[in-house]
């Protein structure tokens, strides 16, 4: 063993130095790697620990691989050398046995002794070869480790640069996130302000709309009252016109009577002049006397004899239109006339709209109880707030020009079926009764004894 150690030291005097150099290079690499790490980062200690553990794991892995491979290679090479040496000795012995005679067998013992010595030398040589191969492998390993350490240093430097850039980018992103959070906070504040403003505006708008609706309802009531007053004024005007017409008739009669009396007086005066004598001579014009007091009216004289019928006077003012007379009896149907020529073919007309209002129970189609068609059924209208304007709308919707009168208390008889409407408020300009202001369809607080009716101009 001492020989082997001396031989190893002799053959490999620099092996210990290489090991020291390799350890120093490892220390230097570790120092350089630790020195190149950033100190000012927040995640510095954990990253350095990770890199140190990574280095230790790599070094242990390489040492384990070298420790396993080197003995295997040495054993294989030793077995190959032994096998070759044995083959060579056997071949030499065979050749010597065949070539030499029996006389030389005494030298075989010497040869065997030499062979054993040679074998021992061969073993020593094998051990030296193994030590050389081991030292060579160590040298190769140290070079590879240095190269690997350099490559790892470069990679680590690149990784550190990338980490620095990542850290700077993360810091920038953090700053941008802080700015974004601040802007979001300001936006939240502005949104809260906007919500408060919108709520206040909504409250104001609701109040203003409520006030406007109240004002509109008041205006509608006023308009309704004014229209009712106007309608009542129109009715009073019609009554006044009728009274004026009657007064005019009375005045015409009085004027006729006065004319007749005037004519009678003129006739009496004519008769008196016939009885008197001839006129005397005209005397001198006397002084004008004082105006006397007006005497009392004289007693009416006796009515004289009616005179001769006078000339026809001027045409007087036309009198008022009298009430319509009773309808006459229908006349006899006349004989049919000759058949006329065939007329031209007319164009296709549009579909006539279905009537939703009708008059029932009157003397004709122009008057009767007002019935309205709704939900597939005919029903009546209650007479609450039923006035001339609603009748005007009904008459116009049926094709008549004006309304003559409106009727309440089932004037044309009580209807059947549902009572659809109540308290209908119309302005008189609507096209149909459905366009008037209607509270609801279907009335339960009214009976058919209050059905409304109307009379239109025929």
UniProtKB/Swiss-Prot annotation:
Disulphides: 382-446, 395-456, 426-436
Annotated ranges, domain SRCR: 357-457
Transmembrane spans: 56-78
InterPro entries: Collagen (IPR008160), SR-AI/II (IPR003543), SRCR (IPR001190), SRCR-like_dom_sf (IPR036772)
Keyword field: Coiled coil, Collagen, Disulfide bond, Endocytosis, Glycoprotein, LDL, Membrane, Phosphoprotein, Receptor, Signal-anchor, Transmembrane, Transmembrane helix
Pfam families: Collagen, Macscav_rec, SRCR
Bias kind Low complexity: ranges: 326-339
Biased composition (Gly residues): 316-325
Principal location: membrane
Any one of the GO CC terms: collagen trimer
Recorded GO MF terms: amyloid-beta binding; cargo receptor activity; low-density lipoprotein particle binding; scavenger receptor activity
Region of interest (Disordered), ranges: 272-357
Extracellular side: 79-458
Cytoplasmic side: 1-55
Membrane topology listed for this record: Single-pass type II membrane protein
Keyword Transcription: no
Domain Collagen-like: 277-350
Assembly notes: Homotrimer. Interacts with MYO18A.
UniProt xrefs under PANTHER family: MACROPHAGE SCAVENGER RECEPTOR TYPES I AND II (PTHR48071:SF16), SRCR DOMAIN-CONTAINING PROTEIN (PTHR48071)
Protein name: Macrophage scavenger receptor types I and II
Gene this chain is encoded by: Msr1
């Amino acid at each position: 063993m001492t020989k082997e150690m001396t031989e190893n030291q002799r053959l490999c005097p620099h092996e210990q130095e290489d090991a020291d150099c390799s350890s120093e290079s490892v220390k230097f690499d570790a120092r350089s790697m630790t020195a190149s790490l950033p100190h000012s980062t927040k995640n510095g200690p954990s990253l350095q620990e990770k890199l140190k553990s990574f280095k230790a794991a790599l070094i242990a892995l390489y040492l384990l691989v070298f420790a396993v491979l080197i003995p295997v290679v040495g054993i294989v090479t030793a077995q190959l050398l032994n096998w070759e040496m044995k083959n060579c000795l056997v071949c030499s012995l065979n050749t010597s046995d065949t070539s030499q005679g029996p006389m030389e067998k005494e030298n075989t013992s010497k040869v065997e002794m030499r062979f054993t010595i040679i074998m021992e030398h061969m073993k020593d040589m094998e051990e030296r070869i193994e030590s050389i191969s081991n030292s060579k492998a160590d040298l190769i390993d140290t070079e590879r480790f240095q190269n690997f350490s350099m490559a790892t240093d470069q990679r680590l430097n690149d990784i550190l640069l990338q980490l620095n850039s990542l850290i700077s980018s993360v810091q920038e992103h953090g700053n941008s996130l802080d700015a974004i959070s601040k802007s979001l906070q300001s936006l939240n504040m502005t949104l809260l302000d906007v919500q408060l403003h919108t709520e206040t505006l909504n409250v104001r708008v609701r109040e203003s709309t409520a006030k406007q609706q109240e004002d509109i309802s008041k205006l509608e009531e006023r308009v309704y009252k004014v229209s009712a007053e106007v309608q009542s004024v129109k009715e009073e005007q019609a009554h006044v016109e009728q009274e004026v017409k009657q007064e005019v008739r009375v005045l015409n009669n009085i004027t006729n009577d006065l004319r007749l009396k005037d004519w009678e007086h003129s006739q009496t005066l004519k008769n008196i002049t016939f009885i008197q004598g001839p006129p005397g001579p005209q005397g001198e014009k006397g002084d004008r006397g004082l105006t006397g007091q007006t005497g009392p009216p004289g007693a009416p004289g006796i009515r004289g004899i009616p005179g001769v019928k006078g000339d026809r006077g001027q045409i007087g003012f036309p009198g008022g239109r009298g009430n319509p007379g009773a309808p006459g009896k229908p006349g006899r149907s006349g004989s049919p006339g000759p058949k006329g020529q065939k007329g031209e073919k007319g164009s296709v007309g549009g579909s006539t709209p279905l009537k939703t209002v009708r008059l029932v129970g009157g003397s004709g189609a122009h008057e009767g109880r007002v019935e309205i068609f709704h939900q597939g059924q005919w029903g009546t209208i209650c007479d609450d707030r039923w006035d001339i304007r609603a009748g005007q709308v009904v008459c116009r919707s049926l094709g008549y020009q004006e309304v003559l009168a409106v009727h309440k208390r089932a004037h044309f008889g009580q209807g059947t079926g549902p009572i659809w409407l109540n308290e209908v408020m119309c302005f008189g300009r609507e096209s149909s009764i459905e366009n008037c202001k209607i509270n609801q369809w279907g009335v339960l607080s009214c009976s058919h004894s209050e059905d409304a009716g109307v009379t239109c101009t025929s």
